[in-house]
Each structure stands twice: as C-alpha cells, then as structure tokens.
Amino acid sequence: MLDLSPTLERALMADPRNYYARETLKDGTPVTIRAIRKDDKESIHNAFRALDREAVYRRFFAPKQDLTDPELEQVIDVDFSQVVALVATVSRADGEEIVIGDGRYVADKEGKPERAELGFLTAEPYRGRGIATLLLRHLARIAHHAGLSAFEADVLAYNAPMLAVFERSGLPISRRREGNIIHVTLSLGSGLN
C-alpha cells in the first residue's frame, strides 16, 4: 500500500484535512493526492462540466447537466469526520494545479456507523489511468485509521471500469446484484496497517 514514515502517517491520519501524498499514475504522470479544499471549487466545477453525459449518469444514476452552487458547496464543504474527500491533482505547464479526480466517503452515523458509502469521479482525459485506484487506496487508509470496517458502493452493472477498480483493490469484496445495480462491500479489516 502506501509507503509513509510512521510519524508522518500518524500525523496525516490524525487530521485528514492536512492529508497530502505524491503518487504516479500508470502512465508515469505525477499526481498529488490531497484533502479537498474550498479553493478547489472552480477546478472541480470545470472537471464536472467536461464530463460526458454517460460518465455523469454512471456516477449520479441520473442525468445532470451541471452542478448548482449549493451542490458545489456540498462537494467542497466536508468535515473530514463523517465526510472525507480527497482530490487527485496535476500541475499544468503554467504551474496551475487542476483537479482530475475526486474520491470521497460518507460515514453512516445512524444505521451502520462502522461503514461508509464510497464515490469517485475522474476527469474525462484521465480515465483509465489509475486515479480511482489511488484515491481508493488513500481513502481506505484514512477510513481504517478512523475505525471504519467497510466501504459500500452502488455501481451500475455495466460500469465495468468502476467494478474493476473494486475487484483489483486487494480488499476483501462482496457483491449483491439488485436489477441493474451491483451493491459492493469492501472490507477494511485486513491488509491495511
């Protein structure tokens, strides 16, 4: 998994608002995985606007033309306790950092407090390069440290790329199909130190 010094890892896990790591995509592109910030609003909005309709449908299970201001605020305004959100960013030639992926979990404080719902979104030109895989790995470490035992996600049955991310995660997985939705549960109990 991640190769962090024990001291640095404890500090990052104690306060995920400061989470930061450097990674490399499958194609060699350097990326930063870090906690979402309020100033990511425009970059996230631009990434969403560039998505094709099918990508939006696979993520939200409904057509959606754009994000409203309240929806954008909800995306960037996280508490890093019940809701943890990380972004993957790259630096453009001019030095501007742009968001190319978003991964988040929302803990279920009521019904199953040890579980969290998981979701990802990857910018169009960066799909298939391992961004969701990296975000999942980092989110799993944070969630495990926070005492969560499992992630849950509902995935459209034809969304093979997302299902493959879960299958290749190295985490114990169970699946249950209901119509065209596959309910995935990933156990965080093993393989995470």
What are these regions (language model features)?
Residues 1-193:
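Long, contiguous binding/interaction regions
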